[in-house]
Amino acid sequence: MGVSMRDGVKLAVEEINKSGGVIGRKLQLVERDDEAKNERGVQIAQELINKEKVTAMVGYINSGVSLASQRFFQEAKIPVMNNVATATVITQQFKAQPENYIFRNSAADSIQAAMIVEEAITRSGYKKVAILADSTNYGQLGREDLEKALTAKGIKPVAVEKFNIKDVDMTAQLLKAKEAGAEAVLTYAIGPELAQIANGMTKLGWKVPMIGSWTLSMANFIDNAGPGGEGARMPQTFIQQADTPKRKAFIDAYLKTFKPKNNRIDSPVSAAQGYDSIYLLAAAIKQANSTEGPKIREALENLNAKVEGVVTTYDKPFTKTDHEAITANIPVLGEVKQGRVVYAYAEDMKKGGDLRVKDAKAAKK
């Protein structure tokens, strides 16, 4: 997902620079890989601030790395646009401070958890569900969001199981879920371990629906799970389908530039959100007519011009008290089908070209 996000960012930077840049200057991209390690993220943050003197930061794939590292940008008054990390608390980490420099254009876990539970309990009618989550900050914070969403529906999970990164055998966790009578497995995890859940079900001869966070859409799940991953469902802010001219242009440019295998973006959500994050920051820099952090933050909180992205068109996506660009009405449910993620519901596919914009009323709740 990190490479897909970076490539989406690169596309946006290239487009903006070809059209003259921002406030008379070309955007310069400084890339670093935090390796999904908190300590590496901290080191990189200090390097980008003190050595590279960056104007703003886009990225963070891993919620744990974001929560450990973004405080340095907050202290330096440099805006951060979280474009993939989804832990609910990310934009709230410094909410009590007079100025909050942390923004996001990915769907928070509180939104995703509610969608997962809505799909499992309300739409599908399951009464018994199990939760399998990894031991990372992302997995455990997501599990908490799932349990809250289930409680709101009057449901208690029949099993709540944890696993570690790089675990290859989920038999023990799956047996507990099966023995408890789970009708569906709800997942929250960041990596290829998700495929081990699907493969474990196949080995046990026990096939129940997998419904989980957006990471079920990633190539490392789809490819490693094979037939066992078919039918898995997850929230998606972006599906690789040319519903609109803007999305078609983005997809065509991505495929032409990066030539992914089978013309499939490994993580379409990451690529799209990476792309949009640059356009949001560029709009703020242009409005501020400055590269000073406080002025960019203020512009982000009061964007005058609409920003056409591939996830949505952003119309005043942020305010001083709301730093989330995505509200619950924007994501749709995706489903793994024949090695790709497609719309889970025909009605969503039919409306794919319709613009789903931020719900200002929902944002204030």
Where are these regions (language model features)?
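Extracytosolic ligand-binding ectodomains
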Residues: 1-365
